[in-house]
């Protein structure tokens, strides 16, 4: 049997972390078994579908490297086929037209709830005489078996059993001729020869309904595996209200695709105590038997730790290529400042995302006027400009550019002025980085370069002279 899996998102919003984990598990299962992976867009819900979401799905999958073998297929391209099959089901007696009004359905629901019963359609139109009904809108319902059980082996959860008496006659075709999710899913899984359906546990209740449709149509049913939900730290369903769930936002904020995949694959699956997996290891080691049943807790700090690991593995050049995208987005000319790779060498060590690196080096390319005035008031005095000019002159005279030469320039300056190094080092740190917290001042100056350092100090001197009153100096 050829393994064929599918990822079938509905483009109604951003691509959720949980959705990408589902896609990843389906993709890995196909790759592990030399099978095929299909991308299917379930876009029949016209009122909720967003074109931008379709583009988001495709772009995100590409960025993550989750390449598909077939697709993307769109359900809206098959509306005619769904309608033809629905008519055939009516003709063969496994589906029927339902003329019940919304008012009747609502009243039925209220009555059942008041009786303590589970709300479901009562089959009123199953045997209705159609000859007395003319020009009335209808939906098409599946004739679900009234007796017996639906029993199937979930590849993660084991044997699951459902009473048919608890399943109602679900709608397969709306009054506007648009097919519903469960119906489309069955037809598409059959047409695409899907062998394994891997999806979230929120779909478990859909599975017996789909299995009954498969059986009624006398077509082969795929195997099912339902993965656990992802919860937040309070053990509530992960949602954008309390934690960003949009995968694309994580990528745009400097999370690496390989880090996201590594984190998500471990969110429910394990291989011993190993935490770090490259994509080839995932394809080799992944199996559904090692996927847990329990819900998983999303831990942003764990994701940041993994992302930091992958950042350290990247070359300075590769990081620089990514950082330049942040500059371009802000329309800042990075060619007017220090070489980005030089700054990356000293700032990447403690950075957990590419965005953190960018934020730390941004000021090196901005005008000194954007500095936090509180820092100037805290560390600059009326004599600071004099100290900076002396330091600048000594720096200009250096013949070799090295960390040792920079240290020597500081030593000569503080010896001449007879004060603590902080009086000159902190102002220079703020002039170059815009922050009072940064790596070694010697490393910063060395990475910034001689000409850029002198240029920025002179600009700062002029700015401070022009704004003495404003700065209370």
Curated annotation (Swiss-Prot):
Enzyme class: ligase
GO-annotated biological processes: glutamyl-tRNA aminoacylation
Positions bound to ATP: 240
Residues annotated as transmembrane: none
Enzyme Commission number(s) from the entry: 6.1.1.17
Motif interval(s): 'HIGH' region: 9-19
Domain of life (superkingdom): Bacteria
Chemical reaction(s) catalysed: tRNA(Glu) + L-glutamate + ATP = L-glutamyl-tRNA(Glu) + AMP + diphosphate
Family matches, as CDD domains: GluRS_core
Motif 'KMSKS' region: where in chain: 237-241
Subcellular location: Cytoplasm
Keywords: Aminoacyl-tRNA synthetase, ATP-binding, Cytoplasm, Ligase, Nucleotide-binding, Protein biosynthesis
Gene Ontology molecular function: ATP binding; glutamate-tRNA ligase activity; tRNA binding; zinc ion binding
Gene Ontology CC, one term: cytosol
Subunit relationships: Monomer.
Protein function: Catalyzes the attachment of glutamate to tRNA(Glu) in a two-step reaction: glutamate is first activated by ATP to form Glu-AMP and then transferred to the acceptor end of tRNA(Glu).
PANTHER family: GLUTAMATE--TRNA LIGASE, GLUTAMATE--TRNA LIGASE, MITOCHONDRIAL-RELATED
NCBIfam families, sorted: gltX_bact (TIGR00464)
Family statement drawn from the similarity comment of this UniProt entry: Belongs to the class-I aminoacyl-tRNA synthetase family. Glutamate--tRNA ligase type 1 subfamily.
Name of this chain's protein: Glutamate--tRNA ligase
Organism: Wigglesworthia glossinidia brevipalpis
């Amino acid at each position: 049997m050829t393994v064929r899996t599918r990822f079938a998102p509905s483009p109604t919003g951003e691509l959720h972390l949980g959705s990408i984990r589902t896609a990843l598990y389906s993709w890995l299962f196909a790759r592990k078994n030399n099978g095929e992976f299909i991308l299917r867009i379930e876009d029949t819900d016209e009122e909720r579908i967003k074109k931008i979401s379709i583009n988001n799905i495709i772009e995100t999958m590409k960025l993550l490297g989750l390449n598909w073998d077939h697709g993307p297929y769109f359900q809206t391209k098959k509306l005619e086929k769904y309608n033809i099959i629905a008519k055939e089901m009516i003709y063969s007696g496994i589906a029927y037209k339902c003329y019940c009004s919304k008012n009747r359905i609502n009243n039925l629901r209220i009555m059942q709830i008041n009786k303590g019963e589970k709300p479901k359609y009562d089959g009123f139109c199953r045997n209705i005489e159609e000859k007395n009904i003319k020009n009335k809108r209808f939906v098409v319902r599946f004739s679900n078996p009234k007796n017996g059980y639906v029993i199937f082996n979930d590849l993660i959860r084991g044997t699951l059993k459902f009473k048919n008496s608890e399943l109602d006659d679900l709608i397969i075709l709306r009054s506007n001729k648009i097919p519903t999710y469960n119906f489309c899913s069955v037809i598409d899984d059959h047409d695409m020869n899907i062998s394994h359906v891997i999806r979230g546990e929120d779909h478990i209740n859909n599975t017996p309904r789909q299995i009954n449709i498969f059986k009624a149509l006398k077509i082969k049913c795929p195997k099912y595996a339902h993965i656990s939900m992802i919860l937040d730290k309070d053990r509530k369903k992960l949602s954008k209200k309390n934690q960003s769930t949009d995968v694309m936002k994580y990528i745009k904020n400097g999370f690496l695709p390989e880090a996201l995949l590594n984190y998500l694959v471990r969110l429910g699956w394990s291989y011993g105590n190993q935490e770090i997996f490259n994509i080839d290891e995932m394809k080799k080691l992944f199996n559904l038997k090692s996927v847990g049943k329990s819900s998983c807790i999303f831990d942003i700090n764990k994701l940041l730790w993994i992302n930091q690991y992958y950042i350290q593995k990247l070359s300075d050049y590769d990081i620089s290529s990514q950082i330049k995208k942040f500059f371009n987005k802000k329309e800042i000319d990075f060619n007017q400042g220090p070489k980005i790779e030089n700054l990356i060498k000293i700032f990447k060590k403690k950075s957990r995302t590419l965005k953190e690196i960018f934020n730390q080096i941004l000021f090196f390319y901005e005008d000194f006027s954007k500095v936090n005035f509180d820092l100037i008031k805290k560390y600059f005095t009326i004599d600071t400009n004099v100290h900076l000019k002396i330091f600048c002159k000594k720096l200009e005279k250096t013949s070799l550019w090295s960390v040792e030469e920079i240290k020597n320039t500081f030593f000569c300056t503080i010896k001449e002025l007879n004060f603590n190094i902080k009086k000159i080092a902190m102002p220079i740190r703020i002039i170059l980085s815009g922050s009072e917290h940064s790596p070694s001042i010697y490393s910063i100056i060395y990475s910034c370069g001689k000409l850029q350092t002198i240029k920025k100090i002179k600009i700062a001197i002029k700015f401070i002279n022009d704004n003495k009153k404003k700065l209370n100096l």
